[in-house]
Amino acid sequence: MDKPKQSFRRHFKPIRRRFKPIRRYLKPIRRHLSPIRSGDRIDYKNMSLISRFISEQGKILSGRVNRLTSKQQRLMTNAIKRARILSLLPFLYNEN
């Protein structure tokens, strides 16, 4: 009845840990210049500004294409929709 005690750790393979290499330098932060200047207001009446963020088919361009922040993109989308409702902008552009 006397059994020799076996080591508990002997039955498991050792876990090899992979360490991340230490970065020698930091990557420079790239700042994209916003296409909206500080003086420009995002407003449904500002047609010269709004027309830059609409495709040729009349679709609202995405934030990645526009290089806008999420807040600016949200305000721009609302301004475009208001301009469409007030018939300042067409909903669809003709293909002619």
Curated annotation (Swiss-Prot):
Entry keyword annotation includes Iron: no
PROSITE patterns the UniProt entry points to: RIBOSOMAL_S18
GO cellular component: a single term: mitochondrial small ribosomal subunit
GO biological process: translation
This protein's record includes keyword Plastid: yes
Top-rank taxon, per record: Eukaryota
GO MF annotations, alphabetized: small ribosomal subunit rRNA binding; structural constituent of ribosome
InterPro entries named in the record: Ribosomal_bS18 (IPR001648), Ribosomal_bS18_CS (IPR018275), Ribosomal_bS18_sf (IPR036870)
Family the entry assigns: Belongs to the bacterial ribosomal protein bS18 family.
Name of the featured protein: Small ribosomal subunit protein bS18c
Record organism: Pinus thunbergii (Japanese black pine)
